[in-house]
Design a protein with these regions (language model features):
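Basic, Gly/Ser/Thr-rich N-terminal segments that form RNA-phosphate-binding interfaces in CRISPR RAMP
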Residues: 1-189
C-alpha cells in the first residue's frame, strides 16, 4: 500500500569456507542450533503425484539446476537455520526418477516402478520450453535465473569477498540500509 515501496533485493547468504561468529546483540533474539559434523550423507525420496511434465521439470530444475554431470558435481545449496553463519551447505547427487502407473495403485498389490532417470534432461527441457512459451522467460539467459545458478555453482564466496570482514547487520542497522548491488556485480561477471 506504500507508493514508495521498492524491493531491496533477494535474500541469500554467502557460502563461506569457515563459520561466522554470531553478533550477539540481545539474548531475546538468539537462537540455538544443533550442528551436524561435516560430510554427512543422507538419502531421501520425494514422492510426487499428478504433476504435468513441465511441473516435474521445474521440480527437477530446483533439485539440480545444471544439466551437465560435470557442472552438477559442483552444485551446492544451503538449508537450515545455520545458513547465515556458514552452515547447511549440501549437494544433491544421484537423482533417480521413478514412475508408477497410477491405475496400478488401485488394481495391484505390488505396484511396479519404471526407472525413467534417462528422461530427466528432456523433462527439464520441456519445462524450459513452456517457461519461454507462456511467460517469455528464457531459462538460459534470464538475469534472475542466471544469478541463482551462479550462486548454486559457487563453492564459497571467500574469493569474491576478499579479506574484508563481512558481518550481519544488527537489528537497528536494518532500518536505514541501502539496497545491495546486484549479485553479478559483486561476483564480477
Amino acid at each position: 500500500n506504500d507508493k514508495n515501496l521498492r524491493l531491496r533485493g533477494y535474500k541469500f547468504y554467502w557460502k563461506r569456507s569457515d563459520s561466522v561468529k554470531q553478533n550477539i546483540e540481545s539474548k531475546n533474539t538468539n537462537t540455538s542450533i544443533a550442528v551436524l559434523p561435516k560430510n554427512q550423507v543422507f538419502e531421501g525420496s520425494i514422492y510426487y503425484e499428478n504433476l504435468s511434465e513441465e511441473e516435474l521439470g521445474l521440480l527437477l530444475c530446483a533439485l539440480q539446476v545444471n544439466d551437465s554431470p560435470e557442472k552438477a558435481d559442483i552444485e551446492t545449496y544451503q538449508i537450515g537455520n545455520g545458513k547465515p553463519y556458514g552452515y547447511g551447505k549440501i549437494a544433491i547427487k544421484n537423482i533417480r526418477l521413478m514412475q508408477i502407473d497410477p491405475k496400478q495403485r488401485f488394481t495391484c498389490l505390488n505396484v511396479e516402478e519404471t526407472d525413467i532417470t534417462e528422461r530427466i534432461a528432456s523433462i527439464k527441457a520441456s519445462y524450459k520450453k513452456k517457461l519461454k512459451e507462456c511467460y517469455g522467460i528464457d531459462f538460459e539467459s534470464d538475469n534472475s535465473i542466471s544469478t541463482y545458478i551462479d550462486f548454486v555453482n559457487m563453492d564459497n564466496a571467500d574469493d569474491y569477498l576478499g579479506t574484508h570482514e563481512y558481518t550481519y547487520m544488527t537489528l537497528k542497522e536494518y532500518t536505514n540500509r541501502c539496497p545491495l548491488p546486484l549479485a553479478k556485480a559483486v561476483i564480477g561477471k
